[in-house]
């Protein structure tokens, strides 16, 4: 497996993997209208370009045998957040997510953080089990608006 930082020249590829993984993960639980709204507002080329150019955000692709298998977005300011981590379904269960998480752990430690956090949809039981297996502990919640659907994310923190 190979992890590479995403550059602005890979914006279209970032949008493609973002949409594909989000759709695989959440389309069965949300309306087409809400998914379309999310894609148009949160995963547009303009929005992703803004995020890519932000000094507090960075994106990473992960490849399995030269095939793009997922991505991660990190936000680094006063805290270290894993804002997005998505793996294509066909690559789940082979250690891709764990490899990305270990990369995030190493990044946060190298920058002097003693913890990191993330939010996960309360009904994403597979992801919740995965995060708990890595030592994440629930510490709160926040709202997440997907189109017109107000959803609840559980906040998890891992301390080192």
Q: Language-model features: where?
A:
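Extreme N-terminal starter segment of soluble prokaryotic enzymes
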Residues: 1-3
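Conserved phosphate-binding and hydrolysis motifs of nucleotide-dependent enzymes
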Residues: 66, 70, 95-97, 135
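Residues at secondary-structure transition points
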Residues: 38-39, 57, 95, 122, ...
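Active-site acidic-Proline motif in GNAT/NAT acetyltransferases
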Residues: 88-94, 98, 122-123
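Short coil/turn segments at alpha/beta junctions that flank glycine-rich nucleotide-binding fingerprints
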Residues: 94, 111-114
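C-terminal "cap" of GNAT-fold acetyltransferases
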Residues: 80, 114-128, 132-134, 141-160
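Acetyl-CoA-dependent GNAT
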Residues: 5-11, 15-90, 101-103, 107, ...
């Amino acid at each position: 497996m190979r992890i590479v930082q995403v550059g602005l020249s890979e914006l279209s590829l970032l949008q493609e993997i973002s949409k594909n993984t989000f759709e695989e993960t959440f389309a069965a639980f949300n309306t087409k209208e809400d998914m379309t709204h999310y894609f148009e507002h949160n995963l547009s080329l303009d929005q992703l370009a803004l995020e890519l150019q932000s000094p507090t955000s960075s994106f990473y692709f992960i490849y399995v045998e030269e095939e793009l298998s997922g991505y991660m977005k990190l936000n680094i300011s006063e805290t270290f957040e894993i804002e997005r981590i998505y793996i294509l379904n066909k690559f789940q269960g082979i250690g891709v997510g764990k490899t990305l998480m270990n990369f995030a752990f190493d990044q946060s430690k190298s920058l002097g953080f003693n913890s990191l956090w993330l939010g996960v949809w309360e009904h994403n039981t597979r992801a919740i089990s995965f995060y708990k297996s890595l030592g994440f502990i629930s510490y709160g919640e926040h709202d997440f608006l997907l189109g017109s659907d107000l959803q609840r994310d559980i906040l998890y923190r891992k301390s080192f």
